[in-house]
Amino acid sequence: MRNKIITSFFCLLLAVSALVGLLMPDRYYSEREKRTLAQKPKLAVADFISGKFSDELEKYLTDQVPLRDGWVTMKTYMELAIGKRESGGVYICKDKYLMDKFTSYSKKQLAANAAALADLQEKLAAEGVSMNTILVPMAAQVLTDKLPAYAPVADYAAILQVLTDADVDTTDVLSALAAHSSESIYYRTNHHWTSLGAYYAYCAWRDVQANADEWTQEVLCDDFYGTTWNKVPLPSVPAEEITAWYKRINRSVSYNNGQYETDSIYERKYLSGNDQYAVFLNSNQAQTVIEGSGKSGKLLLIKDSYGNTFSQFPVEDYAEVHVLDLRFFKGGCGGVRQRKRHHRCIGALWRAEFCEGYKSALLTETARRLRGAGQKADGQRAVGFLPILPTLRGGKGKLFA
């Protein structure tokens, strides 16, 4: 009798869900998951025979299930109840940390991209520019004491060694970050490092002693939930703070050749929305020029979203910071060429997608676009940022996902 009641309940639940699904319009975008949802596939004979249609239909039904967010939360709690400490590719860790899982990668893709980095470095050297690459470790590779017991994690040192063997000039920031693992250097709910973590990495790259007391630290918001939490939306994990670090708050900032100009690198309008991390550098813009406060020449940063937080620090040391995001920057380097002849330091700050769709061809294209882009100058330097997770798995997709 009890089994019949349970079965009847679930049948009723499924029927109600199906009815609601028919009445509700499909959602295009999930604010919680920060991604586009699968849409209803078109039926074609070839796709039906190949199985493509059934795969797309399964993704569509999964993404468009009514009350999806609630189901995801319920699924996570059920997995926790049976002792699992990993859900949806996320480790559920001590101290309420959620960390992206990273255990395997394509050695072939890693080798190809290491060779491409070495080629880019050589081409820049021919222009009198030295390039340095930073391989940013994932939270799970730094905060190892918080991981579930026996949770596997890819070996950071082995990955870095491949770059070293390819003669890529690198800065190993793992030691600098690990020395401060008891501090809030990564978000609990997001894959990015915090402003504090980015600061320690910047000091390691500059080879200077960290001194946080020199900086004004302003809490921009205290209700932040990141994209990792969106995969595992546990109500027991509290919201966290996003903090700005600066010595001078107002400075001239120009986006995309003057299309939008403002007086701060912090775009506070995002703090009241669902993408609060976008407060840094106005989310992800193709081209940004920032007035600096320092006397160390001009710096070119080629970056991804990790560079948004990082950029708070070089603007205090350089006269101007020119930022390119190659995920969105599709034009030529004419404007960059005019500026580059004045740059004494060039930074290539990448989230190189060695893992998920990053192709070595992008590095080759970067070299082509920067090659010959200005006069040589003594002491020029480039820095490359490579977060681990998207770095090594090969596959299709955007070059910078």
Task: Describe every region a protein language model picked out.
Residues M1-K376, R381-A382, P387, T391-G395, ...:
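Extracellular glycan-modifying ectodomains
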